């Protein structure tokens, strides 16, 4: 494909406009056309664009309309940025856009972004992978209008008892809790729900699987929130990392262990 015929998909980050990457900000500054996910992307990011840039809010557009705008702009030699929330690779619906654009000989460059998952864990001040507690993170969502593969039902994933990050599920919090408990998590398992991670109106609700649903409802949280489940949120015990153990030797550091 012609490298001049491309669309740049940019991860806008979780909300705080300062959390976009330098490369992503530069792409916005240089773009002639920007199509952004208006219901999710912080509009303060649009302050970086050129004064004469064409701005489209994709919240009220369908896929065909989005592709049409991008194709026409590329054909006119314009630099096009598709601005997605968080990191485009997580529930970003980018595969279909890449495939549709390829039909017109248009390539795609992807600039990664900071996921809301990592903004949430930063606010919670937690480590998702604690030695001897959990070394696995499952990123998933409950079944809604988009069906889940049979092997990826929440109750089946819950059998692993690992750290779980659940997107797009707070509106179905009762169903989520029910499936997690049925899958094997204890009712006492720690849970945190982070609404609008990194935004000015961010809200954190902590609890357990036993009480988190009621707490979330009490706070009126119905969307744009992430559910994090697992013992890493409130570990009774964990082991320190071997990486910085003075008795552990690796290629960059000698052991202080006495023999």
UniProtKB/Swiss-Prot annotation:
It is an enzyme of class 2 (transferase). Its EC number is 2.1.1.271. Pathway: Cofactor biosynthesis; adenosylcobalamin biosynthesis; cob(II)yrinate a,c-diamide from sirohydrochlorin (anaerobic route): step 4/10. NCBIfam families: cobA_cysG_Cterm (TIGR01469), cobM_cbiF (TIGR01465), PRK06136.1 (NF004790). InterPro entries: 4pyrrol_Mease, 4pyrrol_Methylase_sf, 4pyrrole_Mease_sub1, 4pyrrole_Mease_sub2, Cbl_synth_CobM/CibF, CobA/CysG_C, Siro_Cobalamin_biosynth, Uropor_MeTrfase_CS. GO terms for molecular function: precorrin-4 C11-methyltransferase activity. GO terms for biological process: cobalamin biosynthetic process; methylation; siroheme biosynthetic process. It comes from Methanocaldococcus jannaschii (strain ATCC 43067 / DSM 2661 / JAL-1 / JCM 10045 / NBRC 100440). Belongs to the precorrin methyltransferase family. Coiled coil: none annotated. Keywords: Cobalamin biosynthesis, Methyltransferase, S-adenosyl-L-methionine, Transferase. It catalyses: Co-precorrin-4 + S-adenosyl-L-methionine = Co-precorrin-5A + S-adenosyl-L-homocysteine + H(+). This is Cobalt-precorrin-4 C(11)-methyltransferase. Pfam families: TP_methylase.
């Amino acid at each position: 494909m012609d490298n001049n015929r491309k669309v740049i998909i940019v991860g806008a980050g979780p909300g705080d406009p300062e959390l976009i990457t330098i490369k992503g900000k530069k792409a916005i500054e240089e773009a002639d056309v920007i199509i952004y996910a208006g219901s999710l992307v912080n509009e303060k990011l649009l302050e970086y664009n050129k004064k004469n840039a064409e701005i489209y809010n994709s919240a009220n557009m369908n896929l065909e309309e989005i592709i049409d705008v991008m194709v026409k702009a590329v054909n006119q030699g314009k630099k096009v940025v598709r601005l997605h929330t968080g990191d485009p690779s997580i529930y970003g619906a980018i595969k279909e856009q890449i495939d549709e654009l390829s039909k017109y000989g248009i390539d795609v460059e992807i600039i990664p972004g900071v996921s809301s998952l990592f903004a949430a864990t930063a606010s919670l001040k937690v480590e998702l992978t604690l030695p001897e507690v959990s070394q696995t993170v499952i990123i998933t969502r409950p079944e809604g209008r988009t069906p889940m593969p049979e092997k990826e039902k929440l109750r089946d994933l819950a059998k692993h008892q690992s750290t779980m990050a659940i997107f797009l599920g707070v509106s179905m919090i009762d169903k989520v809790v029910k499936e997690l408990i049925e899958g094997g998590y204890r009712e006492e398992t720690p849970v945190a729900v982070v609404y609008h991670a990194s935004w000015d109106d961010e809200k954190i609700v902590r609890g357990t699987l036993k009480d988190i649903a009621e707490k979330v409802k009490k706070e009126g949280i119905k969307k744009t929130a992430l559910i994090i489940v697992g013992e890493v949120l409130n570990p009774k015990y964990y082991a320190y990392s071997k990486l910085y153990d003075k008795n552990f030797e690796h290629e960059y550091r000698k052991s202080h262990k006495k023999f």
